[in-house]
């Protein structure tokens, strides 16, 4: 990231730093299908950072969860909790060697999914486990929240065609959007960039990606909003 101006992901994109230093630890968040991992990988390539990525397909309960949430909700949730906690622990152990990272999750969001997926007794058990883990997650220097409508999420999920996600329904995505919006309405744990992702194509549009990176490089504190329609 010191002097890097060219990235290579699926294509070469020029990013002009203009003397600006990227945030050291960036976390990208948002609902299912919004493009978290795509953006995290692109930012990591731009700044020559290491990625810290969720591995949803490693969760053996997830496909059954999307078909019938009640039966395996707790197992699905605990698997993700342990996976995220392990990734954070591994990150802390290697931080001295690789201090610059981009993650496609924020540890504090884990209870959001638990709140909408678990019944009361299950949530109490989940919360005990969560508290016992005492996860000392490092604070990001910037959180990027990708926000998109349910229609856009459904379209992107369909377009990427993952078999594991075929059973995701509109109602579930609407509820997820609600809890994400509420969470980030009050979030003050790190500088926050809220991105209107409805009309932005970070996967395929070089211009959209460059506009976003140019905007986030100037952020040092506070809450910011990126609406790509303002740049056109």
PLM feature segments, named:
Residues 1-24:
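Extreme N-terminal, non-catalytic leader segments
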Residues 36:
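Conserved lysine of the Walker
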Residues 158-166, 174-232:
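NTP-dependent small-molecule kinase module
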Residues 39-40, 44:
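Post-Walker A alpha-helix
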Residues 45-83:
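Conserved substrate/cofactor phosphate-moiety recognition/catalytic segment
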Residues 28:
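Hydrophobic anchor at the beta1->P-loop junction of P-loop NTPases
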Residues 72-138:
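Glycine-rich phosphate-binding loop used to anchor ATP phosphates in small-molecule kinases
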Residues 110-181:
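A glycine- and Lys/Arg-enriched "phosphate-lid" helix/loop adjacent to the NTP-binding pocket
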């Amino acid at each position: 990231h010191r002097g890097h101006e060219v990235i290579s992901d699926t294509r070469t994109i020029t990013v002009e730093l203009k003397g600006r230093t990227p945030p050291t630890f960036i976390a990208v968040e948002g609902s299912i299908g919004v493009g978290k991992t795509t953006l995290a990988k692109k930012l990591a390539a731009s700044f020559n950072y290491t990625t810290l990525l969720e591995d949803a397909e490693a969760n053996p309960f997830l496909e059954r969860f999307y078909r019938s949430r009640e039966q395996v909700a707790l197992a699905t949730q605990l698997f993700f909790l342990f996976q995220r906690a392990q990734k954070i622990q591994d990150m802390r152990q290697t931080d001295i060697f690789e201090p610059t990272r981009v993650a496609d999750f924020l540890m504090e969001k884990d209870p959001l999914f638990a709140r909408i997926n678990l019944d009361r007794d299950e949530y109490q058990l989940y919360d005990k486990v969560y508290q016992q883990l005492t996860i000392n997650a490092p604070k990001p220097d910037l959180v990027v929240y990708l926000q998109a409508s349910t229609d856009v999420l459904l379209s992107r999920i369909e377009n990427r065609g993952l078999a594991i996600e075929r059973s995701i329904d509109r109602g579930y995505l609407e509820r997820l959007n609600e809890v994400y919006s509420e969470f980030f309405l009050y979030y003050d744990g790190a500088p926050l960039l809220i991105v209107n992702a409805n009309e932005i194509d970070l996967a395929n549009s070089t211009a959209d990606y460059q506009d976003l990176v140019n905007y986030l490089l100037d952020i040092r504190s506070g809450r910011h909003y990126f609406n790509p329609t303002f740049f056109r």
